[in-house]
Swiss-Prot record:
Record has RNA-binding as a keyword: no
Cofactor remark: Binds 2 Zn(2+) ions per subunit.
Oligomeric and partner information: Homodimer.
Binding site for substrate: 15-17, 41, 136, 219, 251, 263
Domain of life: Bacteria
Residues where Zn(2+) 2 binds: 99, 136, 174
Annotated Gene Ontology cellular component terms: cytosol
Protein's organism: Acinetobacter baylyi (strain ATCC 33305 / BD413 / ADP1)
SUPFAM superfamilies: Metallo-dependent hydrolases
Protein name per UniProt: Dihydroorotase
């Protein structure tokens, strides 16, 4: 199949940042996706519906003329989030979920939840109102190996949480392990997962063999090839529990290429082509539309998009770097490499 037309996809996990960064990130994402779940880990974080609406206005100011883009907003879950904020989310036109970062798990997560049991009163309201809880699924204890943090989260946090709140609508974001994939498969349909392009296309060898490649460094970290293979299998299976979430995360070249580089891969400019490559490599390109355009919207209870995009099987070289902020550069995922699909 050399050409594929699909309903325009949505990105159910993206980082746009704020301020000057929006000049780069919003057009890149809006040219690819009709909607995006916009992560709230700004400085300071987006903690209320009013703050989310204000952030959305800042995003909309950078949408290119003639492009339809609908940012879907998320609140940042803290130890101090009020149960009453959940009803405001439910009644909001643009806010769809709340995001729980374990404190210290990833970029700008210091304000995250210190102990999930402290916020059970809020989670009870999430379950009652069927507001999705989005989870960065890693424990943050210093003694736990970084490659084991997702599995430990499943055992120590997520299993008890779902026993306590079995009807909770929940997305385990950017899953990276076989254990996470199987966990999601074993749950009822109120539990789903997003998968990034980097975790489908690459594994930890790509990051570590032949020199450290900082632009493959993200959290949760790339895992073994066996885990990568399981993710490919579930993503291309047609199971509606798994859908697209890039976790596209912009950091300047200087912030990535230093002695203590930031975590995050910037995939937004060619995201759907990267996913197409992953699906095509296992001869499942016909399954891409469900994963990219159907299952996320269905889970969130939003209508599927009606406009379409077309991808052609035609080589394109991903740019070596892109302009970012005032005078900095950003290195996109797989920079300088050739991929076999192009959005037209």
């Amino acid at each position: 199949m050399d050409t594929i037309t699909l309903l325009q996809p949505d990105d159910w996990h993206a980082h746009l940042r704020d301020g000057l960064a929006l000049k780069r990130t919003v057009p890149d994402l809006a040219q690819q996706f009709a909607r995006a779940i916009c992560m709230p880990n700004l400085v300071p974080p987006v903690k209320t519906v009013d703050e989310a609406e204000a952030y959305r206005e800042r995003i909309m100011a950078h949408v290119p003329e003639g492009v339809h883009f609908d940012p879907r907003m998320v609140l940042y879950f803290t130890d101090h989030t009020s149960p009453s904020e959940v009803k405001k989310i439910k009644d909001s036109a643009h806010v769809n979920a709340i995001k729980l970062y374990p404190a210290g798990a990833t970029t700008n997560s210091d304000n995250g939840v210190s102990d999930i049991r402290k916020v059970y009163a809020v989670i009870e309201q999430l379950e009652e109102h069927q507001v999705p809880l989005l989870l960065h699924g890693e424990v943050t204890h210093h003694h736990v190996d970084i490659f084991d943090r997702e599995k430990r989260f499943l055992d120590e946090v997520l299993s008890p949480l779902l026993k306590q709140f079995p009807k909770l609508k929940l997305v385990l974001e950017h899953i990276t392990t076989s254990e996470a994939a199987h966990f999601v498969l074993e749950q009822d349909r109120n539990v789903a997962a997003t998968i990034t392009p980097q975790h489908l296309l690459f594994n930890r060898n790509d990051m570590l063999v032949g020199g450290i490649k900082p632009h493959f460094y993200c959290l949760p970290i790339l895992k073994r090839q066996t885990h990568q293979q399981t993710l490919i299998e579930v993503a291309t299976s047609g199971n509606p529990k798994f859908f697209l979430g890039t976790d596209s995360a912009p950091h300047s070249k200087n912030a990535k290429e230093n002695a203590c580089g930031c975590a995050g891969c910037y995939s937004a400019p060619t995201a759907i082509e990267l996913y197409a490559q992953a699906f095509d490599q296992v001869n499942k390109i016909e399954r891409l539309e469900g994963f990219a355009s159907h299952f996320g919207a269905d889970f969130y209870g939003l209508p599927r998009n009606t406009n379409t995009i077309t991808l052609v099987k035609e080589d394109q070289i991903i740019p070596e770097q892109l302009d970012y902020l005032d005078d900095e550069k950003i290195i996109p995922l797989y920079a300088g490499k050739t991929i076999q699909w192009r959005k037209v």
